[in-house]
Amino acid sequence: MGACLTLSFSCDEVVNQISQGLCINVGYICELSKNVVAMKKDMEVLKKKRDDVKRRVDIEEFTRRRERLSQVQGWLTNVSTVENKFNELLTTNDAELQRLCLFGFCSKNVKMSYLYGKRVVLMLKEIESLSSQGDFDTVTLATPIARIEEMPIQPTIVGQETMLERVWTRLTEDGDEIVGLYGMGGVGKTTLLTRINNKFSEKCSGFGVVIWVVVSKSPDIHRIQGDIGKRLDLGGEEWDNVNENQRALDIYNVLGKQKFVLLLDDIWEKVNLEVLGVPYPSRQNGCKVVFTTRSRDVCGRMRVDDPMEVSCLEPNEAWELFQMKVGENTLKGHPDIPELARKVAGKCCGLPLALNVIGETMACKRMVQEWRNAIDVLSSYAAEFPGMEQILPILKYSYDNLNKEQVKPCFLYCSLFPEDYRMEKERLIDYWICEGFIDENESRERALSQGYEIIGILVRACLLLEEAINKEQVKMHDVVREMALWIASDLGEHKERCIVQVGVGLREVPKVKNWSSVRRMSLMENEIEILSGSPECLELTTLFLQKNDSLLHISDEFFRCIPMLVVLDLSGNSSLRKLPNQISKLVSLRYLDLSWTYIKRLPVGLQELKKLRYLRLDYMKRLKSISGISNISSLRKLQLLQSKMSLDMSLVEELQLLEHLEVLNISIKSSLVVEKLLNAPRLVKCLQILVLRGVQEESSGVLTLPDMDNLNKVIIRKCGMCEIKIERKTLSLSSNRSPKTQFLHNLSTVHISSCDGLKDLTWLLFAPNLTSLEVLDSELVEGIINQEKAMTMSGIIPFQKLESLRLHNLAMLRSIYWQPLSFPCLKTIHITKCPELRKLPLDSEIAIRDEELVIKYQEEEWLERVEWDNEATRLRFLPFFKFFGPEWQVSYVR
């Protein structure tokens, strides 16, 4: 064993010697542990600072329409890079620390420890540098306002292309400053507005900003200003707390410096742009406002004279949309499904909301039975169909928004009629008066005015649809009708309160669990044969039984326990020949319609109905007598048109005993009766519709008409008079006044046919509100207005309200009027078989509504013979002539 050698030296000296020899920084090794701890600590500080900065950036970008500064983004990127490098260093940290020896002052692998220590020191410096750079006073910069923010929209849209282009033309070419889009709920107004919004991003329109705001019911000015403010980068916590006046000023200052488009979706009342701070659009500032609403009234209050209606889809478009929603696989699931699917789609009547919801509901139904059941449910009580909870409440908003409570029951009443049923406005008003919706103690004129106002409200709210051809009729969209029935049954809770089973093939009155709860019942257009039994309908006020062609018999007991019945309509029951005397038990009855029945005599019990106000007896081809009618003391309106029995001398006497009579619509076949009626001032005042058929004048051949302020319609067929004149005393002059020139101021419709003695209709000068004139098959008529006769009545310009003129088979007709007329309301002229009529009273200078005018003719040779005052007139009106071939037939008024 050899001797030991002991050497004594310090570790520092060894390391120093090595470092001097290698020219390295020994601190990388000696201070590695300390530097790693410092690096970790500083990195945690940096990450917290990074998180704080990022949070500030996110908040400002999200809530205040700002964009992060480039230096902030660069710093965040650098921090991310450093963090990755830091994490990489930490992966070998434990191994490097284990490599140290001599209490951390030396390393088992000096080179490796040196290099790692150097990286730690450099990382520490980089972290410290980034941390010092991360103290930002501001982290974002306000961004320029985006010109347009595109809205999400469903990929499949059907049937809006034409409407979209029309609206776009209004905005960009026609110069309309405010465009109103109105239509019923679920028709696609919001979708259309969304497409308009997105179209601005496709087109270079020159607008600085396009703003979208959803308004909804009960507009919240503060919220709407807030939505506009956010779009204009005015929003923020501080601005949110500013009062509305200051916010309006801020909005005005921004919008007043640029062209803008404001899109307001779903407005229910006038939106005051001034209160919002929105400059009013004008041609000078070039700004636009487009809004959607369910009410045409709102369009008027927004100062839009010509709003654009968004209508339901056409049948082919509706079917296309429905197919998309159902899917090809389902439609091909069975050969019968496509035909059934068309019927289901038809129940939606082109309403996109219903087509979408019902189509999606049926998308997985691949059994024929499921489709048949769907048709059955939609036909009987659609509210129970799956998905209707997504449709009916949306439509109900329009009902809820009816401000007058009086209007709501009138609307619900319209649901008693069949689908797509055309309701006569005045008949509807008569129902409402009898039901008590309109005060029956008002004068007839005032009650009618209220009724027409209610109809107008419902039409403008898109809850009723006005007929395009016959303005005196309205109808209800089928889905809106289902909504009304749902409401009438207390949202489905009390279905028996309002029973409507129309056109479903009933052969008897339906079974009802609780007759005492029934208030209204409509069984129109069925096949009921007998009304028997004695149902205790103590609350029933309305019973519609129209057009049950098989109805033969009503038992004596049927009316015994219906004491509250107000309206009974039995019209159109062509097999019904008798009414029971027990009708006298209907002590509350105010309205009775027996038109188009085969009843020969009115029951004696009818005379006991002391509250009966309205009695209609039209087209009763076997009616022989209504004697005793004077005993119906409360009668206010009697209608006896085109029945076997017409007005006779004794009936004139009876009618004069009816003290409360206000309206008389009557047919007459005798000249003596005409004379007697026209000499009964109180009855003349009641005349509203006068039909003369087969009246042959027995004296002078002149029909002299007195002043008839309420006369609305005149039909003269196969009569022998050679002239119609106005009573002389009507035209007499007083010492201070000129002749009266408007003694038929309510007359709107005149139909004359097969009157071979008449040569002219100059008396029509005194009908200033005439809208429809038909003259047919009268071989001696030479002119509508005779110039010589008219010259004695200077200052009267005829036909200022005329909309429709029909002239047919008038062999001698040479002139309508001897000089051009303005015809400001004229829409259609029908001329057939009038070979001598060579000239129409038209002139190129008159302001006629030529965008609607149609001039129909049937003979090409007639058009070739038409004479024009000048070439300008010919060029203007020739495009409005439309040829109708021999298949076109003239329709005659019954």
From Swiss-Prot:
Molecular function as annotated in GO: ADP binding; ATP binding
LRR repeats: 517-538, 539-561, 564-586, 588-610, 611-633, 634-656, 660-681
UniProt cross-references to Pfam families, sorted A to Z: LRR_14, NB-ARC, WH_DRP
GO BP annotations, alphabetical order: defense response
Result after altering P152S: In summ2-7; suppresses the extreme dwarfism and autoimmune phenotype of the double mutant mkk1 and mkk2
Coiled-coil regions, chain positions: 31-71
Keyword tags: ATP-binding, Coiled coil, Leucine-rich repeat, Nucleotide-binding, Plant defense, Repeat
Record text on activity regulation: Negatively regulated by the MEKK1-MKK1-MKK2-MPK4 kinase cascade.
Keyword Repeat: yes
Residues reported to bind ATP: G183, M184, G185, G186, V187, G188, K189, T190
Consequence when changing S33F: In summ2-6; suppresses the extreme dwarfism and autoimmune phenotype of the double mutant mkk1 and mkk2
Every NB-ARC domain range: 140-443
Phenotype upon changing L255S: In summ2-1; suppresses the extreme dwarfism and autoimmune phenotype of the double mutant mkk1 and mkk2
InterPro entries, per the entry: Apaf_helical (IPR042197), LRR_dom_sf (IPR032675), LRR_R13L4/SHOC2-like (IPR055414), NB-ARC (IPR002182), P-loop_NTPase (IPR027417), Plant_NBS-LRR (IPR050905), WH-like_DNA-bd_sf (IPR036388)
Subunit description: Interacts with PAT1.
Domain notes: The LRR repeats probably act as specificity determinant of pathogen recognition.
Protein family (similarity comment): Belongs to the disease resistance NB-LRR family.
Function: Disease resistance protein that mediates defense responses against the bacterial pathogen Pseudomonas syringae pv tomato strain DC3000, and the virulent oomycete Hyaloperonospora arabidopsidis isolate Noco2. Becomes active when the MEKK1-MKK1-MKK2-MPK4 kinase cascade is disrupted by the microbial effector hopAI1. Does not seem to be required for the activation of MPK4 by flg22, or flg22-induced up-regulation of PAD3. Functions downstream of MEKK2/SUMM1 in immune responses, including cell death and defense responses.
Record's protein name: Disease resistance protein SUMM2
Protein species of origin: Arabidopsis thaliana (Mouse-ear cress)
